[in-house]
Amino acid sequence: MAIHGIFFGSDTGNTENIAKMIQKQLGKDVADVHDIAKSSKEDLEAYDILLLGIPTWYYGEAQCDWDDFFPTLEEIDFNGKLVALFGCGDQEDYAEYFCDALGTIRDIIEPRGATIDADWPTAGYHFQASKGLADDDHFVGLAIDEDRHPELTADRVEKWVKQISEELHLDEILNA
């Protein structure tokens, strides 16, 4: 088993593809990828470092598999766990709800002890509002728009993986 658990929910395949891009950059021996629809509480508890991928649907709704998993997520003690979030949204058609699900999942795991890191700058995005903001200038995690700007995805993922590797001290953990 790898030391990082990447968990995603996806209806269209976009968030799954992002999860696999992240795994490829980190290394398959370092990160396991799991579909949240096929995951259990014990699957998440097995990792000290979690990367959680959640897309936002329509008017700020969480993807259905995550929505179904939220009661289980509420049972997990996240104390001692490092968490980085990533998510997909549509900043044009749903500009007032862009990546809201990032905020939804943060609001579930943060009170349960999760240390959430890896904020991502809002610069370069064009949206009206988001519950997925850490502050006025940052999302709580990586925000991806595969609907409007798929050409930016690979570069954003690469930069974010480098960022989380530094912020979560992944090199130190791997070499310990």
From Swiss-Prot:
Cofactor: FMN
Protein name: Flavodoxin 1
Family membership noted in the UniProt record: Belongs to the flavodoxin family.
InterPro entries: Flavodoxin, Flavodoxin/NO_synth, Flavodoxin_CS, Flavodoxin_lc, Flavoprotein-like_sf
Residue ranges annotated for the Flavodoxin-like domain, each copy included: 4-165
Membrane-crossing residue ranges in chain numbering: none
Keywords, comma-separated and alphabetical: Electron transport, Flavoprotein, FMN, Transport
Signal peptide location: none
Function: Low-potential electron donor to a number of redox enzymes.
Any one Gene Ontology molecular-function term assigned to this protein's record: FMN binding
PANTHER family from the UniProt entry: FLAVODOXIN 1, FLAVODOXIN 2
